[in-house]
Curated annotation (Swiss-Prot):
The keyword Oxidoreductase applies. The lineage of its organism: Archaea, Methanobacteriati, Methanobacteriota, Stenosarchaea group, Halobacteria. Its EC number is 1.16.-.-. This is DNA protection during starvation protein. The dps dodecamer comprises iron-binding sites for iron translocation, oxidation and nucleation. Fe(2+) atoms are initially bound to the outer surface in proximity to the iron entry pore from which they are translocated toward the inter-subunit ferroxidase centers via two discrete steps. Iron oxidation proceeds by transient formation of tri-iron ferroxidase centers and Fe(3+) atoms move to two distinct iron nucleation centers where iron mineralization occurs. Fe cation 1 binds at H52, D79, E83. It comes from Halobacterium salinarum (strain ATCC 700922 / JCM 11081 / NRC-1). Homododecamer. The 12 subunits form a hollow sphere into which the mineral iron core of up to 110 Fe(3+) can be deposited. Belongs to the Dps family.
Length: 182
């Protein structure tokens, strides 16, 4: 536990940024949106890691690798979100408790499910995050924060790409023969 008595920045407070010419009111709106995205992406990250660790079956290797890479992508997106929150004069959500409490996406429980169910759950979270990111991109643009909007668009491209891959994995076409399924 930290022995520091005086916090340099208080969670929930937004100063804005003179360097970025972003006043506290506009910055606070962006920070709130970015912190919500940060919480959601970290939930996604942990769920992807869970599925990466527990995947089994005929497509194990491909799915194991994909889920690991998708988790890395989610972590990179989360890092960009947190860095931008800080640049705008806010404090990024960091504790597991805060991240889970602030997430608007449903967290999968601790049980292990078949990979089709797991991927469907992942795709649902991706969909929720994609919708929120689009809304927050528009918010940032409307507030004149074009850099945040650009950063969100870049993350959105990565997240949409992984969601699209999951959609392909969930298709009915397979190389596994019917006999192997029985």
């Amino acid at each position: 536990m930290s022995t520091q008595k005086n916090a340099r920045a208080t969670a929930g407070e937004v100063e804005g940024s003179d360097a970025l010419r972003m006043d506290a009111d506009r910055a606070e709106q962006c920070v709130d949106a970015l912190n919500a995205d940060l919480a959601n992406v970290y939930v996604l990250y942990h769920q992807l890691k869970k599925h990466h660790w527990n995947v089994e079956g005929a497509e194990f290797r491909d799915l194991h690798l994909f889920l690991g890479e998708a988790a890395e992508t989610a972590e990179e997106v989360a890092d960009e979100l947190a860095e931008r929150v800080q640049a705008l004069g806010g404090v990024p959500h960091a504790s597991p408790e805060t991240l889970q409490a602030e997430a608007s996406v449903d967290v999968e429980d601790e049980d292990v499910y078949d990979i089709r169910t797991s991927l469907a759950n992942d795709m649902a979270i991706y969909g929720d995050i994609i919708e929120a990111t689009r809304e927050h991109t528009e918010l940032a643009e409307n507030l004149g924060d074009h850099a945040t909007a650009h950063m969100l668009r870049e993350g959105l491209i990565e997240l949409e790409d992984d969601a699209h891959h999951i959609e392909h994995y969930l298709e009915d076409d397979t190389l596994v023969t019917q006999g192997a399924l029985e």
